[in-house]
C-alpha cells in the first residue's frame, strides 16, 4: 500500500499583518474609482475629504431667529377667545360684570376674615398678663425686665436647669429636699425652689381672678390636673360573687337615668 505525503491545510491559513485605515481607504477608492463614471468618482472624492477632516471641529450653532410674535401657534389667542366661566350651568364670559362682582365679593370676604383673625390675635395678646412685671401684652418669656435680671432663670428648665428643653418635656428626677423646682424663682416672695402658684404668700395661687379647682378646691392646679380625678379614673372596683349568680352576669356601672313618662295631650279637632 502506497502512502502519499500531503501538506496539512492549517499551515496555509496563516493570519496576514493588519492593514491600516489609510491603506484601506486608498485601496478602496483606487479600485472602485477606475470602474465608476466621472460623476460617481467626484462623489467618492468628496466623501474621502469629509472623512479625512478632523472630528474635533464641530459646527457652530446658528442663532435662532427672534420671534416677532410670542404667540407662535396661536394658542394664547385661542384662550382669549374661548375664556369662559361656568356658573350654575350657564356659560359666562370672564370679562362680564357678574364675574367681576363675584371676584369683588370674594376679596371683600377674605379681607374681613383676615381682619377678624388679627382682632383675635390682638385680644389674646392683650389678655395675657406677665407674672413678673404684672403688665398686659406679653408673657414672662418676652418680658424685658425678666430678661435683664439674670437671677430669674428664664429660658431654662426649672427642674434640672437645662437650656435644651422645657419643664413639660423634662424627665429628670430631683431630690425632694430641694423642692419640686430647684431652679425656679418665685415671683411673689423671690425665693428659689417653688413657683408662685404654690407660694404660701400667694393665697390665690394659680387663679389670679379668684376661684380654685372644682373637684378639691385647691388653688395649685387646674381641674384637668387634679389628682383626685386621676385616681378615681384609675381605680377598678370588682363586685362580689353571690350564690346562684349566673356565670355570664355583667355588672352595669352606669345606671341609666329614669325617664319621665310623657303625658299625652288630647288632640282637639275643630270643624
Swiss-Prot record:
One Gene Ontology term, aspect cellular component: nucleolus
Modification type Phosphoserine: residues: 48
SMART domains: ZnF_C2HC
Residue spans, zinc finger CCHC-type: 128-145, 155-172, 184-201, 211-228
Keywords: Metal-binding, Nucleus, Phosphoprotein, Repeat, Transcription, Zinc, Zinc-finger
Gene3D superfamilies xref list: Zinc finger, CCHC-type
PROSITE patterns tied to this protein: ZF_CCHC
PANTHER family assigned: ZINC FINGER CCHC DOMAIN-CONTAINING PROTEIN 9, ZINC FINGER CCHC DOMAIN-CONTAINING PROTEIN 9 ZCCHC9
Biological function: May down-regulate transcription mediated by NF-kappa-B and the serum response element.
Entry protein name: Zinc finger CCHC domain-containing protein 9
Source taxonomy: Eukaryota, Metazoa, Chordata, Craniata, Vertebrata
Gene this chain is encoded by: ZCCHC9
Amino acid at each position: 500500500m502506497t502512502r502519499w505525503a500531503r501538506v496539512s491545510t492549517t499551515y496555509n491559513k496563516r493570519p496576514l499583518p493588519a492593514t491600516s485605515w489609510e491603506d484601506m481607504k486608498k485601496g478602496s477608492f483606487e479600485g472602485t474609482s477606475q470602474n465608476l463614471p466621472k460623476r460617481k468618482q467626484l462623489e467618492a472624492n468628496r466623501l474621502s475629504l469629509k472623512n479625512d477632516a478632523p472630528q474635533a471641529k464641530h459646527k457652530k450653532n446658528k442663532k435662532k431667529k427672534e420671534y416677532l410674535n410670542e404667540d407662535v401657534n396661536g394658542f394664547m389667542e385661542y384662550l382669549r377667545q374661548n375664556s369662559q366661566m361656568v356658573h350654575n350651568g350657564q356659560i359666562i364670559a370672564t370679562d362680564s360684570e357678574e364675574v367681576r362682582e363675584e371676584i369683588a365679593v370674594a376679596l371683600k370676604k377674605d379681607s374681613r376674615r383676615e381682619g377678624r383673625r388679627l382682632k383675635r390675635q390682638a385680644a389674646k395678646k392683650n389678655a395675657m398678663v406677665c407674672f413678673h412685671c404684672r403688665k398686659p401684652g406679653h408673657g414672662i418669656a418676652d418680658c424685658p425686665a425678666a430678661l435683664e435680671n439674670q437671677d430669674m432663670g428664664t429660658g431654662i428648665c426649672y427642674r434640672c436647669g437645662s437650656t435644651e428643653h422645657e419643664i413639660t418635656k423634662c424627665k429628670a428626677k430631683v431630690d425632694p429636699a430641694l423642692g419640686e423646682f430647684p431652679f425656679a424663682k418665685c415671683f411673689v416672695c423671690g425665693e428659689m425652689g417653688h413657683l408662685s402658684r404654690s407660694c404660701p404668700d400667694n393665697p390665690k395661687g394659680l387663679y389670679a381672678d379668684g376661684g380654685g379647682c372644682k373637684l378639691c378646691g385647691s388653688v395649685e392646679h387646674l381641674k384637668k390636673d387634679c389628682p383626685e380625678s386621676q385616681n378615681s379614673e384609675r381605680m377598678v372596683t370588682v363586685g362580689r360573687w353571690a350564690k346562684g349568680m349566673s356565670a355570664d352576669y355583667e355588672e352595669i356601672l352606669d345606671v341609666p337615668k329614669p325617664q319621665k313618662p310623657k303625658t299625652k295631650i288630647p288632640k282637639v279637632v275643630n270643624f
